[in-house]
Amino acid sequence: MPDLKNLVEKEMLELVHSDLGYFTLCLFAPFVEETVFRGAVLRTLLPRMKSRWAAIAISAALFSLVHLNPAQMPFAFIAGLLLGWLYSRTGSILPGVAYHWVNNTVVFAMARLLPPQIINGHLIDLFGGDHRRMVLSVIFSLFIFLPAIYQLNIRMRKA
């Protein structure tokens, strides 16, 4: 039986470096995935479940499972929660498609531009092995991300 993790990684790397890679991963995939997981799955679950967050969590779990790569699943689940929240707040898949496009484009660019040892390594490798710099960067990112989500939530309540 083939090693699924290595097979998925190999297929993704080949796709990133192919002529259709950007179209497939950054334009087509976000539209299709948002249509399926937010436009169909979440839209169906929201009116049928008592808890909005339970519906969002189920669609996020399905979204993460479809990515097939165990290393991607935790991030895909968290992204699925954010995308589900965006859909539940706006009733539209378009904000999710935009977020998904930006995310996939950044990952695509990193895969094309950064050396393979960085791409195949760990987060700490991006910081030259310096744990302090990595932790400070993550904390700094959270200081930007969390207030941004809070402000977005406030502004969406007013709308």
Language model region names:
Residues V32-I58, W85-S92:
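Membrane-interface helix/loop boundary segments of multi-pass membrane proteins
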